[in-house]
A protein has these predicted regions:
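N-terminal single-pass transmembrane signal-anchor helix
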Residues: 1-30
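Compositionally biased non-globular segments, especially hydrophobic aliphatic-rich helices
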Residues: 11, 40-43, 120-121
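Conserved catalytic core of two-component sensor histidine kinases
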Residues: 16, 43, 50
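Short, intrinsically disordered, low-complexity terminal segments
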Residues: 20, 34, 89-91
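Regular, well-ordered alpha-helical segments
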Residues: 24, 32-35, 51, 55-58
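Aliphatic-rich helix starts adjacent to a transmembrane/signal segment
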Residues: 29-46
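Periplasmic/extracellular, small/polar-rich flexible segments of pilin-like filament-forming proteins
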Residues: 47, 51-127
């Protein structure tokens, strides 16, 4: 009788196939998670911009289109732009460098609607 202390080739192949199947399932889910994190950063920046705009308005009785005049700074990779601002409202959009085709929009007061945002204060992103 033979003394076997290792794995057979078939057993090793089965393990490799199982690992391959698990990787094929996990990798696409990881990619979608990364995109969700980028969108969350963009939405967070637009919420922070809203707070900065309201703070600026409280001091100056007008909204601003200039980001340096507010206390706002965006997250890494996020570009925020204020397309319109006056004494009664403002409109802004933001996009992450890794998702350039999925911008998000928001507005306040008479600044909107903007992009997909149709309700004041709501942040809407391109699906």
């Amino acid at each position: 009788m033979r003394n076997s202390k290792g794995f057979t080739l078939i057993e090793l192949l089965i393990v490799v196939v199982i690992i391959g199947i698990l990787a094929a399932i996990a990798i696409p889910k990881f990619g979608a998670t990364k995109d969700k994190a980028y969108i969350a950063a963009v939405k967070s920046d637009l919420r922070n911009l809203s707070t900065a705009e309201e703070s600026y308005f409280a001091d100056n009785v007008v909204y601003t289109t200039s980001l340096p005049t507010t206390s706002f700074s965006s997250s890494a990779g996020v570009t925020v732009s204020i397309s319109a601002a006056n004494a009664t409202g403002w409109t802004a959009s933001a996009v992450h460098a890794s998702l350039p085709t999925k911008p998000c929009f928001t507005f306040a007061g008479t600044g909107g609607p903007s992009g997909l945002a149709t309700v004041e204060g709501e942040i809407k992103c391109t699906p």
